[in-house]
């Protein structure tokens, strides 16, 4: 067999436990108008049809049908600095043999650029009822390390996307109170590659190779399975699955100039299945078996306010709370019940606060600005795949109306993340006879530039 895969299915999600632009792997980039104000006021502002993705109750404010489409390009810069040590240890006849290899865990720009698209439509049915539909990406990440990366079991390639399809309705209960409800279908795809790195060098030691020959399969032929650093030890190619959830919102408008909104998005369970899953830890290397993993996208709650202070100036704010502690651990098993993988995540619930302002310079041009602070979710367990960190947003944006029906949104944001130090450790084997261990010490710092463009049309 050309490659063995260590907990293919579960590791796919484990190694995707990080994010460059929002806590863990949650994305905030649902619209360009929101980008320009650091997504302050999302549950209370009805700039355009993107309310489908934020608070469906806001659809009751629309007098005519509206279409909005566009996206945000994320140009991330994440640099990793550190060192890695790998060792293979075998104990036979009470005699221990150990081979230790040291290397570099440093690499620059581990996150490539990515485009986050969106598409929305809102249609009022009558004075009280409105319908809406939309497509956006609210969870996702991508990171890439060199194939020969010394800490290959932690780096490699990770590509996770969760496309959310939404159908919503809004009902105006009273002149000031509106309610909204929606259903979500999430199409998720995952691609993961992890390489042996220094593990391959440690098992090539002559004493270790000799001692391995006395072991049972699959460990006896480890040298053959791991001929080089770039040998794949985890491979999950474009596995896809569907998950379903719901969202709800309430909006209360005190008057034309003041309103508040509250929106909730439920958790979404996604069941991945891999009929070629293998696991070194479960001694399944030479032939794959069907493996199963249920992964949860967390629920979140957002409270927002909008206040038109003058004819030209408005302020808006948001508090967003995401229930990341639902992800306590990742567990994958084979059809026969044998454990393939079990990993504690230690995620913490996180908060995001944002403050923004809009200014109508003249009839055709609206300017925006905002600032936000986004708390990390993986404060107790960080990952080299994309290390999570607290980050601050600085945003600017504008909307220009070419005609009463056609407008364009432009937005820019600079995200600055805190410098973080963390360690990753991976141990394979029973620790009584054979142990393969890799330990990496990291220092990372991230920043990103975000560019948004949306086209809006009112019918």
Curated annotation (Swiss-Prot):
One of its GO terms (molecular function) is long-chain fatty acid transporting porin activity. Residues 1-22 form the signal peptide. Belongs to the OmpP1/FadL family. It comes from the Bacteria. Keywords: Cell outer membrane, Membrane, Signal, Transmembrane, Transmembrane beta strand. It is found in: Cell outer membrane. It comes from Haemophilus influenzae. Transmembrane segments: none annotated. It is a multi-pass membrane protein. InterPro entries: OMPP1/FadL/TodX (IPR005017). Pfam families: Toluene_X. GO terms for cellular component: cell outer membrane. This is Outer membrane protein P1. PANTHER family: LONG-CHAIN FATTY ACID TRANSPORT PROTEIN (PTHR35093:SF3), OUTER MEMBRANE PROTEIN NMB0088-RELATED (PTHR35093).
